[in-house]
Amino acid sequence: MTVEIANIVGSGDLGVELDVEPLEADLSTPYSEYDPSNYHGLYVRLEENGPLITVYRSGKYIITGCASMESLHETNEEFLGMLADLGVTEEDTQTGFTVENVVCTAMLDELVSLNALAIGLGLEVTEYEPEQFPGLVYRPEEIGAVLLVFANGKMVITGAKDTETAESAYEYFQSKVQELV
């Protein structure tokens, strides 16, 4: 099985402080919500069931829920264009937009005992407390990602900054499992 993207998160900084309450009223999007008694961020969706943008008074924002890098960057560009049209920012505002986290899923080629895996991989790079969490957490220093491995063979790869890192993490882990089996 290949590694599949589950979620991509990116963030940027508009470089200006925002009054988010009137901003919510000015936005013409399918979904926006600002309830400071519940949370201090403004939630925005540019399309129904689309990626979620959380905007803060500081001008910082986070985009979550994208299934591809293309979707993440398109959502960012559309959001910035909308803010420029409202006069909130300049057309060419540099936000330093970066990918923060690529979350992927995959399946192990074969099932293994998580207890045996924790011991084989090394207790210094694994956490496995089945009474607290049903998965094994693997944090190898060699790769830029954290892997969650479950008894049914499903894996979640998180902390990567790009899909290549997630795929490399999967391949690295598969080779480690093969060494142990």
Swiss-Prot record:
SUPFAM superfamilies: TATA-box binding protein-like. Sequence repeats lie at residues 5-83, 99-177. Keywords: DNA-binding, Plasmid, Repeat, Transcription, Transcription regulation. It holds the Pfam family TBP. GO terms for molecular function: DNA binding; DNA-binding transcription factor activity; general transcription initiation factor activity. Coiled coil: none annotated. One of its GO terms (biological process) is DNA-templated transcription initiation. Transmembrane segments: none annotated. PANTHER family: TATA-BOX BINDING PROTEIN. General factor that plays a role in the activation of archaeal genes transcribed by RNA polymerase. Binds specifically to the TATA box promoter element which lies close to the position of transcription initiation. Belongs to the TBP family. This is TATA-box-binding protein C. It comes from Halobacterium salinarum (strain ATCC 700922 / JCM 11081 / NRC-1).
